[in-house]
């Protein structure tokens, strides 16, 4: 909220609000998670001021709720995100993503020789937490990559 307590992005009556997305990550989430493949209204706030983060992105999707799996898959991109369930303009549920064991149907394998590029299969990566990194192992070629390599793909 601004100092005069006005919302910078209009409130929604029912749906999902993904808040505290790192700045410049909102559009990537929209495309990777196919959040725009709906006829419901989507409101996007980019580079909004944030006391905690300096700047943040925000996504509001009316009449749509994320599954627990979708919420947890956000952890790679927005580990500090808050996912709010809204009903009748009130927050009725709040969750934070936690790193899942697998990420399916979202990422693309960076190995150009991987069979997932030539065959009609859904992507699938095992998530492995390392000391200072997160590694992703492709189900098909079994190669392991730093999450930054896969995310840049």
From Swiss-Prot:
Keyword Metal-binding part of the UniProt annotation? yes
Q: Which UniProt keywords apply?
A: Metal-binding, Pyrimidine biosynthesis, Zinc
One cellular component (GO) term of this entry: aspartate carbamoyltransferase complex
One Gene Ontology molecular-function label? metal ion binding
Q: Which residues cross the membrane?
A: none
Give GO terms for biological process. Answer: 'de novo' pyrimidine nucleobase biosynthetic process; pyrimidine nucleotide biosynthetic process
Q: Which cofactor does it need?
A: Zn(2+)
Please explain the role this protein plays, according to its UniProt record.
Involved in allosteric regulation of aspartate carbamoyltransferase.
User: How does the record describe its quaternary structure?
Assistant: Heterododecamer (2C3:3R2) of six catalytic PyrB chains organized as two trimers (C3), and six regulatory PyrI chains organized as three dimers (R2).
Family the entry assigns: Belongs to the PyrI family.
Task: List, alphabetically, the PANTHER family matched.
Answer: ASPARTATE CARBAMOYLTRANSFERASE REGULATORY CHAIN
State the protein's name.
Aspartate carbamoyltransferase regulatory chain
Q: List the source organism.
A: Salmonella typhi
């Amino acid at each position: 909220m601004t100092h005069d307590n006005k919302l910078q992005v209009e409130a929604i009556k029912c749906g999902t609000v993904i808040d505290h997305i790192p700045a410049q990550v909102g559009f990537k989430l929209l495309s990777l998670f196919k959040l725009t493949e709906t006829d419901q209204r989507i409101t996007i706030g980019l580079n909004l001021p944030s006391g905690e983060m300096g700047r943040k992105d925000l996504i509001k999707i009316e009449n749509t709720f994320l599954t627990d799996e979708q919420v947890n898959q956000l952890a790679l991109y927005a580990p500090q995100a808050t996912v709010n369930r809204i009903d009748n303009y009130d927050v009725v549920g709040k969750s934070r993503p936690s790193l899942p064991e697998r990420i399916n149907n979202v990422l693309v394998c960076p190995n150009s020789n991987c069979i997932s590029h030539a065959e009609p299969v859904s992507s699938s990566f095992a998530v492995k937490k390392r000391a200072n990194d997160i590694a992703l192992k492709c189900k098909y070629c079994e190669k392991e990559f730093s999450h930054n390599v896969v995310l840049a793909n």
